[in-house]
Amino acid sequence: MTEVQAMVEFSVELNKFYNVDLFQRGFYQIRSSMKIPSRIPHRVEASLLHATGMTLAFPASVHDSLICSKTFQILYKNEEVVLNDVMIFKVKMLLDERKIEETLEEMNFLLSLDLHFTDGDYSADDLNALQLISSRTLKLHFSPHRGLHHHVNVMFDYFHLSVVSVTVHASLVALHQPLISFPRPVKTTWLNRNAPAQNKDSVIPTLESVVFGINYTKQLSPDGCSFIIADSFLHHAYRFHYTLCATLLLAFKGLHSYFITVTEEIPSCQKLELEEMDVEARLTELCEEVKKIENPDELAELINMNLAQLCSLLMALWGQFLEVITLHEELRILLAQEHHTLRVRRFSEAFFCFEHSREAAIAYQELHAQSHLQMCTAIKNTSFCSSLPPLPIECSELDGDLNSLPIIFEDRYLDSVTEGKLDISQDDSEITQMEHNLASRRSSDDCRDHQTTPSLGARTIEIKPSNKDPFSGEKITVKLGPWTELRQEEILVDNLLPNFESLESNDEDTSSDVKSSCSSKPNLDTMCKGFQSPHKSNNSTGTAITLNSKLICLGTPCVISGSISTNTDVSEDRTMKKNSDVLNLKQMYSEIPTVESETHLGTSDPFSASTDIVKQGLVENYFGSQSSTDISDTCAVSYSNALSPQKDTSEKEISNLQQEQGKEDEEEEQDQQMVQNGYYEETDYSALDGTINAHYTSRDELMEERLIKSEKINSDYLRDGINMPTVCTSGCLSFPSAPRESPCNVKYSSKSKFDAITKQPSSTSYNFTSSISWYMSSPKPQIQAFLQAKEELKLLKLPGFMYSEVPLLASSVPYFSVEEEDGSEDGVHLIVCVHGLDGNSADLRLVKTYIELGLPGGRIDFLMSERNQNDTFADFDSMTDRLLDEIIQYIQIYSLTVSKISFIGHSLGNLIIRSVLTRPRFKYYLNKLHTFLSLSGPHLGTLYNSSALVNTGLWFMQKWKKSGSLLQLTCRDHSDPRQTFLYKLSKKAGLHYFKNVVLVGSLQDRYVPYHSARIEMCKTALKDKQSGQIYSEMIHNLLQPVLQSKDCNLVRYNVINALPNTADSLIGRAAHIAVLDSEIFLEKFFLVAALKYFQ
């Protein structure tokens, strides 16, 4: 094994320090260090690039491989401190020359950020004067070809709520023979396993042994006048030279391309004349020169000289890059936007949504809860969670991993749920009616430009009222998501176009010019170029179909329209052409996730061996040069669905589908069993034998074919850098669809609101922004594993849809974004946070933090209720009076002009909130109520708690504390159940005054019953002949006004937390408080969905 010396240089900028909610005033300092695995012989050199700005209390300093930031003093709440410390870490290491790229891709570069503090006297020379109070470790996922260019906000732990913003740039800068010795760990054996770790310095090899191999020895020629080289050593030298030169040239190309993009996209960047390099020609030239040399000494020297020249060019470019972009504010903003978008998109995985009619909210929902559990188990049995790719810079404590990410289920209750069947209309009147129906589904401003079609193949099981109980039913309506719809649409399209195999691209920008392929900013000229398919003949009818798909650029948004012409029926052609957008958008949208990104760098596949690529004559593509590339698979997916099914070509498919759907009445019993098992199987593929068997012999073969197609698409544009046409909307973020290192001009505003949350973007209102590929910066094996896992999920035919398929999520604005206040808003949005039993005002501290971070620039004021924290065992009337006094006094003392009032309650605090709403003194504020977020609130009491252990504990606590509130929770505070506190409270008006009623519960919570937190009927209550009727009446009293109010939006959540096996988890306490203290749950919940309720 031949080892070479590699050097990767990291530029780490500590931009700002934010005091989110620190408890102590004093001096703070951040210490940074870089670590890599000890099995790799390495040395780390640390330095400061240059001192900038104020020195604050003490300047930054370097201590061996440790760098200390400026020492700064924190005195005020929400204080921001500008650090602008630029730290340089040079990591020199020995790598196997056969696995340079693989090793660098897989290596864990760990950046440690330690927060130190002192409130006493401090001397800069004494490092021990400051104590370590919190630490975070960032894992940097480095690519030798693309480098690393990213920005993250690193939040320290709960007890030291503060954030430091960090920008990281990294590049490979050198590859050559080993020039220094490296400490190499000594292998331990069973004899010395307890001995302290020891290192010995590696021996510096000679140049010849590096170039020709460790076994190389000089051989004299037969005439004795010169030396000769054996073929094996010569081939080793050529391979060694090529591998290192190709890697260096690719690193140069990637850094050069990113540099060009930055300087062009950001006007304020210093413009430099950067020398263009044809890396393919340069590599060929270097290899040809080497092959001309016969003398071994001269050959080794020439190879060494070539490597030295390339390293010099790369280092010079890296120096210029740092000089221009270091501490550049506009670039930092763009990188922050990119990271935030990727992070929110990652959180949106395993966040499911189900749509129900509003009437279903009051029906018996027990089967839904069991369905959630079974879905969760099925998901965990797949590789989906374990294959979730990391972010370019990840911190498992902040971003979550397999062991910490929760699975969340959302139940929406809408006025109408689209459950139409496929219907190809034959006249304009039918299509006009369909357009009218679709228009009614266009709800919010954010979705008004996106047309939708009825979801294909959705099935309905009607709810038939039970004679025994008005709130239970024999059947349940199940809304099927786009996963199952996708496959039926693919079947139809595949049969419509059996010979539709290739699509030539006329896009002039499919070259490797990284300036265009990196840029995320949509180029309207490029987007408007046409894509035309060759004429293909349909085997069944002989009908020639011409697809003229073009991008119609009307500012933003842009939509793809397909015009279809046939040579059989002119009138039908006119009808289909006229309504092609309406009929096709759903099909196109449901296919788009397969093509995961529109634009990518024209760089090589990071795991492709450069030697093999050159031998195959693919150097052109490897370096991203312009090439003629077959994109048939890519276009077959993106454009085949733009073709509307026509009567002439798809009559058989339509009839089969309608025949299958006509069997619903015969299959009701099977359907009921499916729902009870937690799944709802859509139309089976066997029902479409006539259409499937034309291409595939089995379902397995069909799914395998789709998976291969999906993987091939991703590998094609990863390797060739094809510029797929980009489609943007006004709410589209440019970064996710572009390479992660490509900045662009991004405009955003936290003031965007959902005028009616009840009409949220659903699975049917799909958009091209849903093809955001947050994981495309990951190594190819991780991408393939994740795509495989997503295919496994599709095979499960899970109901509903995932938020990762929704184009617009709740948060699009990075934390700490500075925005102008919206002067049109009068007054502040007051959010009152109320703790639960035996709690205090700090219980909802994290909830407050993530709302504030997620809505920067918003006029929000928080009242963290503390009036009841000394006595939460009192009766509810007493606690209600205290909270009401606290709210009114807070508004009066601070002279607040309140435009909105929202309440967030935990556990018992939710009942105090509801009680406040009924008081006459609060009547003035009822018309200002906005959102009620209930976190594990016992709205129906604890009457049917399934945990005997918890019931016993609460009974003991009630007796011990003589607690009125605990007695009232059990509905035993009066002999007449209809005179109990909870029943009388349910009769009083309250919840329907809110715009949003959000109920969060968990099946893992044993303290508050799941059905009580979500205000649902439970099986035990149905069987209880004494109190069950009272329970049903309470549910009806609470929900009926909410459902009757058109302005009130009801949403329920079920949270399945990833909890450790502890006593708290066993008794259900861990899940009960996870809604308060789990940073990962709160960020996922608010960033993906819940922030919109507070906008």
From Swiss-Prot:
The keyword Glycosyltransferase does not apply. The keyword Cell inner membrane does not apply. Residues 643-673 are annotated as: Disordered. Pfam families: DUF3657 (PF12394), DUF676 (PF05057). Keywords: Coiled coil. InterPro entries: AB_hydrolase_fold, DUF3657, DUF676_lipase-like, Lipase-like. Gene3D superfamilies: alpha/beta hydrolase (3.40.50.1820). Residues 269-295, 646-670 form a coiled coil. PANTHER family: LIPASE ROG1-RELATED-RELATED, PROTEIN FAM135A. Belongs to the FAM135 family. This is Protein FAM135A. It comes from Pongo abelii. The lineage of its organism: Eukaryota, Metazoa, Chordata, Craniata, Vertebrata. The gene is FAM135A.
